[in-house]
Amino acid sequence: MKALLPKCSKLVLDSGRSSLIALLAFAFIESGLTQAVEAAEDPGTPSAEAERFKDTEIRVIRPRYFNKSKRFELGAAMNAIMNESFIYTFMATGIATFHLNEEWAIEGTLSYGLNLDREDKRVLFDEFDIKTQIFRTQYQAELAIQYTPIYGKWQLPSGRLIYFDTYLTAGLGQTGIEWKYDDFCEAPSPTDPNAEALPTNAVKGYPTFMVGGGQRYFVNRTTSYRFEIKFHRFLFNEIDAECTPLKAEATGQQFATGTAHDVITILLGISRFF
Amino acid sequence: MARLSQFAATFLLLASALLSSQGLFADYKQAKALYSKKNYPKAAEAFFQVYEKSPKKVEKRKAEWGLAQSLEKMNLAYSASKYYSVIVRRGRIPENPFFRSALEELGKINSRISLGQSHIVQLFKTEIRLADVPGPARGFYFYYKGVEAFGDKSLETADKHFEMVPSGSPYQLGALFHQGVIANLQGRHSRAIALFEKVLAGTRDRSEYRELQEMSLMNIARVNYEIKRFAEAISYYGQIPRDSENWLDAIWESSWAFFFIEKFNNTLGNIHTIHSPFFENRFYPEAYILQAITFLRMCRFDQVKESMKRFKDRYQPVFGDVRGMMNRYKGDPKGFFKFIYDYRSGSITSYRKAEEIVKKLSQVDAFKEAMDTIRFTDRELNALKSKGSSWKGGALLEDVTNFLESKKSTAILDAGQRVYKEGNGYYAQLLDLSNQTKLIVAEMQLGKLANLRALISIGDADKKAQFIGGLQQLNINQTLEFWPFEGEYWEDELGFYVYNMPSKCNVQKDSK
């Protein structure tokens, strides 16, 4: 098989920066210095891009294959949560992005999905009588800023070229968790008159912070496939996970209102540029 | 008694003559009947019998026409062209009633499969009055009369003939193209461009005319180059599609245009494409010379020497093989043709170092035309094995086969001669370029750099235009992408290279 080597014209990733936030901040600052190469620049005169290639004796200069600047991107995708041990969560996702320029974009995503219990959950309950606390993600709504530091291409063994870009994203939003108390709470004893009834199953929304990264593969000048991995942290109210909240409150037990729970999602989708 | 026997003998003779005549008449009728029943192989055989044996001229002529028509219906167009050509060569005379129709049929066949220029030129050696050329055959007739005159360098006559090609004829675009060439040769550049533009408009979105369209683009570029409108020339070269056989020629020719508008980095970028491993067997020896003089213009003398060295390294081994090859096939055009044919089929065993010239020769028009003729004749010869197997006696089969074999043989001979001549030209070009490299090196060694640079001085061409890679002018609304070349050639990057190398001339002046 032929080696598939990417070539990147805009490699600004600094391997020394481990934090994505720091990387985004760095990228933001850097973008103020290096704008997308506008054709108004004379390829023979110094410019930010020319400066980047000042030591390159021979270079290819041509119109960019895929322009995103000032274009809308609408997409559909399938999102899956990867780190919930006892359920599968699949969410249908709609994506709407506006690309401010080739590097920066604002993106809104809305995911809504279903949760399926895994076999492990059933085995634990049936064989060991263990009930598991589960965060059933019902929806995610996020608004993010996206930065694209890498634009590259791959050559397939057939000789066909696939252009791609790699982006980083960070944003805020809300995650809706469906609480199903019979998942993990013991039903109150019917013989105990003081027993507190289980809370009613409900979907509750929590503020969410998200970071991630992904790639678009441009199949033509209007369509791309997307692949991304995101890390979401939402802050939930501990009392929402309590089986007997009234009793707990009465005993003076303290409940944190911002306990973090992390979710990792993987997304595969297709989007179209307008 | 003797009288009686004499009378009886005379009667018998008459009767037999009558019978035989009725038999022949019956054969023609039978042939016609077979043709009407669409039994074309049998009809062809029957017509051939009449054509060969009938003593009646009128019937013979009819059988000749019927034979050609039957063969054409059998999809043996080349074979049919033999009999149509016999009719046409006889000229417009009263006892040749099918002259006009045969001419028309030949025109139709030739627009589908090329009959070959030499065949057609022979055909029109016969003097034909304008009135005798039927409307639908006028394009065919005047186009080839024009081509013949053009070959004889009678430009005005050729132009008149091409002018007579009616609009709507399949030959019209070819005629306009030739008129464009003539106009340019006559120094009427604007008219030449206008004519090539007409061809472009006529060939747009018609894949069957792709070659003509590309040649028109190349010619518009060349005319612009000739009148020193280099930026326009480059924009036309830039319209040649990447998958075209003409694309590398466009890259090469535009390198010169860039040179004359002092876009040396674009010149060097184009040469970088030509010298890429993708084109290592392509014959562009002059690219090294242009590279050297471009470096010379940039006062990069070490790189001039390097270019000259690379020319020498690459072409010195080629000289011996080319010389050997040309000597070996001197006076043997058929052998030379076969040698190139073998190269195309991948079975070349000798003169391997001459490969890039052999490759170039395998792409010249004369060779390609002959290859078409061989392909069509072979196809018919194969078809005849099955279609002609029912022909009794084999006389028709032999007649047609002989014609096809002879046509093939003539095409090979003619192409062999023309290609050999072309090969000699390339060899002379190599020699000339070799001398040029020696001159450049010698002048450099003598320190006559100013003289040398003056020899290649550039005029007051428009130097304002800015170009990116791919022969494209800078467009202010475009976003560009940059890829560094790091020793690895990517196929999609070919043609887009631009050097990033400043001239050293100012530095040298300053240091003095």
Model-derived regions: residue spans:
Chain B
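Alpha-helical segment of the N-proximal tetratricopeptide repeat
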Residues: 25-49, 138-152
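Extracytoplasmic/secretory-pathway proteins
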Residues: 48, 98-99, 105-129, 133-134, ...
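Short solvent-exposed coil/turn linkers within tandem alpha-helical repeat scaffolds
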Residues: 51-60, 87-101, 114-118, 126-139, ...
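"A position-specific structural signal for the A-helix of alpha-solenoid helical repeats
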Residues: 29, 66, 105, 137, ...
